[in-house]
């Protein structure tokens, strides 16, 4: 009988002993699961942050490329707009010399023929310059504009003249579209 009681006690304690480890195992599993979940959530948050950073960098790079493209196109348009500016500046003295040659009075037939040829060259050169957007700056009788005119001399205002008016052009000025190649050298009434 004592043996039976002992066995019975062992049976009763055994299930109690078995129950205790199951609770610990469940708790451990739950803790491990919670740790893994929090680690995964942290990893997901980190990956989301990295993705947001990459997206931001990508958008900034794309915007920078667009800005560079716009700047390049603008510079290219400026270059094309003012293409030939240096050539035009070097041709202007030739045009001045042709005008001086045309200002000379001739009396004989040979001189008149020569002057006619010079006039044709002058007209052709002016037309070619105009075709490329190079025009003479209007100055005589105009109000003095320091962006277009260079005053080399001033004279007192005479009757019928307005102050700050160009009364004489010493050397013609030229502009390429809206850019001044050479200001007109003028005499201004003051």
Curated annotation (Swiss-Prot):
Residues crossing the lipid bilayer are none
Region annotation Disordered: where it falls in the sequence: 1-41
**Molecular function in Gene Ontology:** adenyl-nucleotide exchange factor activity; protein homodimerization activity; protein-folding chaperone binding; unfolded protein binding
| InterPro entries, per database record | GrpE (IPR000740), GrpE_coiled_coil (IPR013805), GrpE_head (IPR009012)
Q: Which GO terms describe its biological process?
A: protein folding
Q: Gene3D superfamilies from the xrefs?
A: 3.90.20.20, Head domain of nucleotide exchange factor GrpE
Q: Which family does it belong to?
A: Belongs to the GrpE family.
Q: Subunit comment for this entry?
A: Homodimer.
- Give the protein name, as stated in the record: Protein GrpE
